[in-house]
Amino acid sequence: MAGSFAQLAKNAEKKKPSISVSKEPVENPPLKVYQLGDEALRTPANRIVKVDDAIRKLAKDMLITMYSSKGIGLAAPQVGIQKRLLVIDLKFEDPNSPPMVFINPEIISSSATLDTYEEGCLSIPGVYLNVLRPSSIKLSYRDEMGRPKKMNADGLMARCIQHEIDHLNGVCFVDKVTDEEELKKQLNENNFKRSDVIKETN
């Protein structure tokens, strides 16, 4: 009977609700994406104490907003909500690829190997610049049902997670750009101010 109870528990786990949304863009996304220069992007987010329907609704609205902007990642501070929540979908054009929801994500460790790759951001449209980051990370977080998870990520997933976690800490990717000339050029071309960039000192 123990085996039967274990199987029932496993099946019940599978039947728990998860977040499912269409990846088709909508004309009026539910959330506004704030842009560089707004204080919302510079305010550190708060930990989520309880994962409930309200948090799942927020994650769903964030996904709809992200898909409508053809993005692959979005953090709650980008939509003016200071909660430690982010959503990612590297295959936003694949309707069969499920998105990922990260609640209270924390990087446990990161590789000594660093990679440079071009990044962009829904909060800084039109700006694409190289950023140096660890090539792989180990992460702890909770999923949309509040279940504790750990994962290893490398490549684009590792980069996207790091980029979005930066947002949770009030950091934008342009803060990490070392090519000052190209930074100023692209910011100016896209009507952003260099004074809104907070350069990292470490």
Curated annotation (Swiss-Prot):
Active site residues according to the UniProt entry: E164
One GO molecular-function entry: metal ion binding
Pfam families referenced in this protein's UniProt entry, alphabetically: Pep_deformylase (PF01327)
Cofactor(s) the protein needs: Fe(2+)
Region annotation (Disordered) ranges: 1-24
Family the entry assigns: Belongs to the polypeptide deformylase family.
Stated name of the protein: Peptide deformylase
Gene it is expressed from: def
